[in-house]
Amino acid sequence: MYQVLLFIYVVVAIALIGFILVQQGKGANAGASFGGGASGTMFGSAGAGNFLTRTSAILATAFFVIALVLGNMNSHKGNVQKGTFDDLSQAAEQVQQQAAPAKDNKNSDIPQ
């Protein structure tokens, strides 16, 4: 269930990005290169803006709802397994107990 919602979440995010990029801007008319500014488009002169605005609003709502559901599902996972890094104090104690004292090496080249 989590993987299906995650897949839908990614698809909605990509679709939302696409619909926002295709919309006609106020100044630059970036959407006109994709047919958003022409009057003879598939949706008519005013229909494309209305369709793109509604679809973007629906996709944005779905994006936030799915994000909340995924966050809720992720926070309520009951079977949390103990990981390797959960209890590092035991490993530190073992390392301290196994440490050997340093030998005095009189023939060493390192000054003391």
Swiss-Prot record:
Renumbered residue ranges of the record's region Disordered: 92-112
Keywords: Cell inner membrane, Cell membrane, Membrane, Protein transport, Translocation, Transmembrane, Transmembrane helix, Transport
Stretches that traverse the bilayer: 2-22, 51-71
Pfam family, one: SecG
InterPro entries: SecG (IPR004692)
Cellular component, GO, one term: plasma membrane
Chief location category: membrane
Matching NCBIfam families: secG
GO biological process: intracellular protein transmembrane transport; protein secretion; protein transport by the Sec complex
Biased composition (Basic and acidic residues): 103-112
Subcellular location: Cell inner membrane
Biased composition (Low complexity): 92-102
Protein name: Protein-export membrane protein SecG
UniProt GO MF annotations: protein-transporting ATPase activity
Membrane topology reported for the UniProt record: Multi-pass membrane protein
Homology family: Belongs to the SecG family.
Entry function: Involved in protein export. Participates in an early event of protein translocation.
